[in-house]
Every structure is written in C-alpha cells, then in structure tokens.
A protein has these predicted regions:
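Hydrophobic transmembrane alpha-helices of multi-pass small-molecule transporters
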Residues: 1-62, 66, 196, 200, ...
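Juxtamembrane and boundary regions of transmembrane helices in multi-pass small-molecule transporters
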Residues: 1-2, 129-141, 148-221, 274, ...
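Transmembrane alpha-helix interface/packing and boundary motifs in multi-pass membrane proteins
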Residues: 16-25, 102-111, 143-154, 326-333, ...
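Membrane-embedded alpha-helical segments and adjacent helix-loop junctions characteristic
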Residues: 33-36, 40-130, 190-195, 199, ...
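Interfacial segments of multi-pass membrane proteins
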Residues: 37-42, 165-171, 357-358, 447, ...
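Generic detector of multi-pass transmembrane helix bundles and their immediately adjacent loops
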Residues: 401-402, 406-487, 491, 495-504, ...
Length: 518
C-alpha cells in the first residue's frame, strides 16, 4: 500500500521527468525544485538535501571543468587535432580512423564538452577545405567522446556521480580504470561501427540558406558569425524579441538553425534553445570576447579563436594532467595508505592539487574561474544525490524494484540487469544523464538487496547506460553542440545512434556479469 510520502515522491518524480522532457527550465532548477518539495513534506532533512553539495564526486566534477580549461587554454587540444587531420585528399573512413581513437583517448581523461568545443570548429573548417561534408564527422566526434568517457572514472560526470553514491551507500567505489574493463570493448566496437557505417547513415552537408545576401559582408569590422548556444547563455527559453541580443552582445541575430531547419521569418517570436546555431552580424569585439567561453561556440567567423600558447605551456599542462592520472591510480594501491596515513590519495585530492597549480601558473585565468564552471550541471548533480535519498527514504525505490521483479518472467539477475539498462538508457535519452543516474541508482540498490546478489554489476550498468546517449541530441550536451554545428535533424541521431545503443546494450549485458559476478 502506498503511503503519503510515497505518493509525494512519485508525483515529484513524474513532474521532474515531465519538466525535463518539455525543457521547462534548466535541469538544475528543476531538480532543486523537486528536492525543496521533498524537504517541505519531511521526506528529506536539511542535512540530506544538502549532502550532495559537499560530495566528493560533485566537487571533483567542478575541479575537472577547470583542469579541462587549463589544458584547452594551453592549445594542446587544437594542436593535437590539427596533426591528426590529413591535409591531402582522403576518404571519410581514413580520416575517421585517424581521428576517432585519439578523440576517445583524450575524452577518457578530460570533460567531453571542451573537447568537442575545441575540435568541432577545427574539423568543420578542415572538412570544408578538403571538400568532404562536415556532417560525416561531427556526430562521430560527439559519440567518440562519449565512448571514451565510459573507460575511466573521470571520463564523464555520470561516473563520478555514481561513484559518489556508491561511497555514500557504504560500498567500495570504482578505481580509476575499473570501468575500462567493459568500457574499452564498447569503445572499440563503437568506433568500428562508426568507421563502417557513419558515412552511409549520416547526411550530406546541408547548405546555409542565409549568407552574404544581406548585403553587409563587405564591411571591414563586421563579420557573418555562426555561434552555437551553450549551456550558460542567459536567453535560453526566451523569445528573440524579448531578449535584447544587441544590448547584451553587440550583435544582431539574422537566422536561427535548428534540427536541420533554417528559421528566418518571424524571428522575434522564436525562443532560444541550447544547441541552436545563431547566424549573427557581429564585429571583432564579439569574436574576441566570446570566442573562448561556455556561452557560445563560434564557428564560421573568418577568424581563428582557438587558444594559443607556447610549446612549454602545452607540455606543462599535459604533464600536470598525466601526473594527476598517475597519482590517482597509484593512490589506490594498498601500500599508499600505509606510506601516507591520514591522507586520502584519491581522484579528488589530485584534481584539487592540479587545479591549484594550474591557477597559480596561469594555465587558466584564475580571476575568471567561475565562468568556466557549468553551475547548472553541478546543481543537477548535487540535487541528484538528494532525490536518490528521497526514493530510498520513502520506500519508492523498493516498490519500483519489486514491481520490476514481478513483471519479469525470469527472476534471473541477468534479465533484471538488462531491464535496468533499458530503463536507465531511456531516461538518459529523454532527460539528462545525471538525472537518469539519480533515478536508477536506488533501483539498483533495491534490486540487488531483494535478489540477494552483489550490487556492483548494477552500478556499472548505470554508468554505461546513463552515458550511452546516442539516439537523441537532448540527452548529452555534446550531441546538442554538434547538432547545431552540423545542422543535423533529430532523425539523423536516431538513424545512426539507435544501432549503437543496441550494440552497447548487448556488450554490456554479456560482459558486465562476467567481469563483476553477481
């Protein structure tokens, strides 16, 4: 029988999912609203509501944002992709064979978003120069970063979120490369799939419908600029007519590209959305100010906005990154606890040290560090911990887990593992990966407890399924970015992404129980 608290939690979860699907607000505010609802009804205590804001996993994500910026500002990423891109005439498969493995490797250790933000404009300009459709490379770029992120603890924020929940539940967390035991097989299979099928399944280039016909392209200080709306753009969900773009940014919106459609007429009534490509009429100051920010990703502007730094700075940034990874890996070894008692040499420790060194050596502008952190993602993560706790406190997690078991003809853990993968993956395609993990984690705990088996296979499945956002552009931020840059339609993601989702599912449900037995 449902209690009053269960009804409130169910209504809160239904409202949360609905608001996320309809994009009513930013995800962080939606999840925060739900946690406040649970607080008001006594389902969460103030301490339980705020625990996520001090969780190591959440703070580590914030530190990795800054570390990614430090590596990006050094110019190392731009130099890497330029060396990988063939300058002579080539084929799509040959170019992808050079790019995708390296991109996956990089994204295993850096936040996926800055990797895509740096690589996508460079790849687009290169594709135009060698006369190959850029649309053949941009979705594979996003997918390669997602696949790489599955291979390490720090590869994606979802892995750190689940790891934080595991530690809070009293279990041993993931090692740095533990997820790679299954992630590397998925990444290799995914890259092979992209090499053989992406050229056939992805569209040819879609030409722009608006360009120099405005008669303004001859001005010396103004340029036709294409800018993809990022997560920190303040006008998301506001109408163009209500948001004074000229006053905010000194540029005029001429066109909006969305899901393969160019919007020119009645622009004032159109609402801005994350991932939209804006065709702007802007001057040099706009390019210099917003060329390196999380507000926009600048594309066709006639100027190179890639960060530039000396060779020594590039090598120093990469050395710090390698030392952080090695330190966190060695810190997991048993003898380190005896060598340095009282010091927890985990990923958080080394990320914090690396961030401080990067700040004081000016690898990123320390005075402006707040603009490089995606606060909405952090609030989403922090509130995800509270929502997961509310599902456990109210008994909702047990009710849902019991229902899943009852609906399954076979009570085998293998079958229920597959069911959990499908549920988590559907949520991540419709809402966000971190919110999906928040909903799935208490289910994993309840399922394992009711079956009397190890929860670790279920935890790993959540990490993989919540990251495997291939079939829609809305489940993962990098998909939204390349959708705007490549002018893709929603169906483009379904056509190439759905088989990759199925491939990931098959590999996961076969290998995970073998590597992490029940």
């Amino acid at each position: 029988m449902l209690t009053f608290e269960m009804i409130i939690v169910f209504l809160g979860l239904i409202g949360m999912v609905t608001a996320l699907v309809l994009d009513k607000m930013r995800p962080g505010m939606i999840l925060f609203s739900v946690t406040v609802l649970f607080l008001c009804f006594g389902i969460l205590t103030p301490k339980e509501m705020l625990e996520g804001f001090s969780n190591k996993g959440m703070i580590t994500v914030a530190l990795l944002f800054l570390i990614s910026v430090g590596v990006r500002q050094s110019g190392a990423l731009g130099q890497l992709i330029k060396k990988l891109l063939p300058q002579e005439k080539t084929t799509v498969m040959k170019a992808q064979a050079r790019m995708l493995p390296a991109i996956s490797f990089v994204s295993a250790f850096l936040n996926n978003t800055p990797v895509v933000v740096i690589f996508a404009p460079i790849i687009k300009r290169w594709a135009e120069s060698v006369r190959i459709p850029a649309t053949k490379f941009l979705i594979p770029l996003s997918y390669a970063t997602i696949l790489g992120g599955m291979c390490t603890l720090i590869g994606t924020s979802t892995n750190l979120v689940v790891d934080g929940m595991i530690l809070d539940a009293g279990y041993k967390g993931f090692g740095m490369f533990e997820l790679g035991r299954v992630g590397i097989f998925i990444a290799l299979a995914g890259i092979v799939y992209l090499l053989f099928f992406s050229s056939r399944l992805l569209p040819e280039v879609r030409k722009d419908t608006v360009g120099d016909e405005h008669g303004e392209a001859d001005a010396s200080s103004f340029h036709r600029v294409e800018a993809v709306i990022g997560a920190r753009f303040p006008g998301i969900n506001k109408r163009v007519g209500d948001f004074n773009f000229v006053r905010h940014y000194g540029a005029e919106v001429k066109e909006i590209k969305r899901s393969g459609v160019s919007i020119v007429d009645n622009l004032s009534r159109v609402k801005f959305r994350e991932g939209d490509t804006l065709v702007l009429w802007a001057d040099d100051s706009f390019i210099s100010t917003w060329g390196d920010s999380s507000v926009f990703v600048l594309l066709a502007n006639g100027k190179d906005t890639e960060p530039k730094a000396g060779r020594k700075k590039r090598w120093f940034a990469l050395t710090l990154l390698v030392l952080m990874i090695v330190g966190a890996t060695v810190g997991e070894l048993p003898f380190m606890e005896e060598l340095l008692p009282g010091i927890d040499l985990d990923m958080f420790f080394f990320a914090a040290v690396t961030t401080v060194i990067m700040a004081w050596t000016k690898l990123f502008p320390a005075r402006k560090y707040t603009k490089y952190i995606s606060w909405d993602i952090l609030i989403t993560i922090a509130c995800a911990f509270a929502i997961s706790r509310a599902m456990v406190n109210s008994g909702v997690a047990d009710i849902i887990a019991h229902g899943i078991i009852d609906m399954s003809d076979d009570y085998s853990p293998h079958v229920l593992l597959a069911v959990l993968f499908i549920i988590t993956n559907l949520f991540t395609e419709l809402i966000t990966n971190n919110a999906a993990a928040a909903l799935a984690f208490p289910l994993a705990l309840s399922l394992s407890n009711q079956l009397g088996v190890s929860p670790m296979p279920f935890f790993v499945v959540i990490c993989i399924a919540a990251s495997a956002s291939f079939s829609t552009p809305i489940g993962y931020q990098t998909n939204l970015i390349v959708q705007g840059i490549g002018n893709y339609k929603f169906t483009d993601f379904v056509r190439i992404g759905l088989p990759l989702n199925i491939l990931t599912f098959i590999i996961s449900v076969i290998l995970i129980p073998l590597i992490w037995p029940f």
